[in-house]
Swiss-Prot record:
InterPro entries: UppP. The gene is uppP. The chain crosses the membrane at residues 6-26, 45-65, 90-110, 116-136, 190-210, 222-242, 252-272. It catalyses: di-trans,octa-cis-undecaprenyl diphosphate + H2O = di-trans,octa-cis-undecaprenyl phosphate + phosphate + H(+). GO terms for biological process: cell wall organization; peptidoglycan biosynthetic process; peptidoglycan metabolic process; regulation of cell shape; response to antibiotic. PANTHER family: UNDECAPRENYL-DIPHOSPHATASE. One of its GO terms (cellular component) is plasma membrane. This is Undecaprenyl-diphosphatase.
Amino acid sequence: MSDMHSLLIAAILGVVEGLTEFLPVSSTGHMIIVGHLLGFEGDTAKTFEVVIQLGSILAVVVMFWRRLFGLIGIHFGRPLQREGESKGRLTLIHILLGMIPAVVLGLVFHDTIKSLFNPINVMYALVVGGLLLIAAECLKPKEPRAPGLDDMTYRQAFMIGCFQCLALWPGFSRSGATISGGMLMGVSRYAASEFSFLLAVPMMMGATVLDLYKSWSFLTAADIPMFAVGFVTAFVVALIAIKTFLQLIKRISFIPFAIYRFVVAAAVYVVFF
């Protein structure tokens, strides 16, 4: 593979990762399809995907750095208030409660989960995840009990964490599972999305660093330019995608995302079967 060809592949996959990682459309499904079409598969490809995920995570840190510092008691300027005055405040406990279910389940069933990484399981997950998005839009309370992040209860955070367990099924979409769960628990669409992004930082950082440690041997000095291009591209695109997504969901529901998931599932079927 020539240098220019590998850098082009890195840029394409960086765009795909950045666009889809935090949208409820399954980055796994997209990466499987695009990686297959580009002929970029195998151990090096898996390590590359881990590295560019770090770029996407960094975008969330940059977007929500004030809120993240606030979770550990460090505040800059006036206290954050999203939608009117709130009696409470989002704390580190909310994040920990949102993490516990998936962390426990992920550790217990780690090997089983890894065995699910194949096109057929991803295809089914895309469909089921799309149905959950539709269910969340149809069944959510008319008036959210938690219009803003600081209105969320510990129970809501824990229940969102339980929904996050669905994302252990490859192709389901972590953001799709957590946002849908939040809406069903009475959290507004916007606040549920913000909480999903905040929850992604420790969850994805931990999983990504662990995967990177295990696959470090597949990274060579010759791969560094390619990995750097993918990392930076994923970071920039994810930053734009998150900002756009948060503005978009103020005006539209998640139904279009659900329909898109069904289209991607059909694409997986066509490409692999």
